[in-house]
A protein has these predicted regions:
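Ser/Thr/Pro/Gly-biased, low-complexity, turn-/loop-rich segments
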Residues: 2-6, 10-13, 21-191
Length: 191
């Protein structure tokens, strides 16, 4: 049996390196629905605080938070489902419920008083939970979280987002827009 030669060691080393590195890119680019979620009308979820105004009804005008079950508790009508609805849909739903024996022609407007949080994890200076503001990008969120560590992969990040009730993770570049509720994970670079 021939002894191992330097060429054989080189070939085995390259084969092992190829096998190891082929597992490094297990994420696919974000699906189309992932990107489209950033341009769709905002949908409500747990943690959103809403400013609801009922014209000429100061006792009903107040701030209401979407609870963990996805509902708001509104005077006279009780629990109203809010999760997955746009502001316009919820406004119409509340007006409809108020019309059923409470008010003749209710005028309901809704604004987001405070969006649900985003989370920034991984190779950033201060991982944690942060307030979302409309127009926030991955790069802005990383800056708010103390910037990159020296080990961070600065080319792209993994964002986990709930779309149509499903939790999806996609790899995006740092100029990508984010939405309320996103979790951003900055990976460690290989070299």
């Amino acid at each position: 049996m021939p002894l191992a030669t330097p060429k054989m060691f080189l070939a085995l080393g390259l084969a092992a390196m190829t096998a190891v590195l082929s597992g490094c890119n297990t994420y696919k680019p974000a699906p189309k629905a992932f990107q489209q979620a950033t341009i769709q009308p905002y949908t409500l979820d747990s943690g959103d605080r809403l400013r609801i105004t009922v014209f000429d009804q100061p006792s009903m005008t107040n701030s209401y938070t979407v609870d963990q079950a996805g509902y708001i508790a509104f005077p006279l009508v009780g629990q109203v489902p809010a999760r997955g609805r746009t502001l316009q849909q919820l406004s119409g739903q509340l007006a409809g419920k108020l019309r059923q024996g409470y008010l003749r022609d209710p005028d309901v407007t809704i604004d987001v008083d405070r969006y649900r949080s985003i989370f920034v994890m991984g190779e950033v200076g201060q991982p944690g939970q942060y307030a979302y503001v409309p127009g926030l990008t991955v790069q802005n969120a990383i800056a708010v979280a103390g910037g990159y560590t020296s080990r961070a992969n600065q080319a792209s990040v993994d964002v986990t987002r709930k779309i149509n009730g499903q939790v999806i993770t996609g790899r995006v570049n740092i100029s990508s827009a984010i939405i309320a509720g996103d979790t951003i994970y900055v990976r460690e670079r290989l070299f």
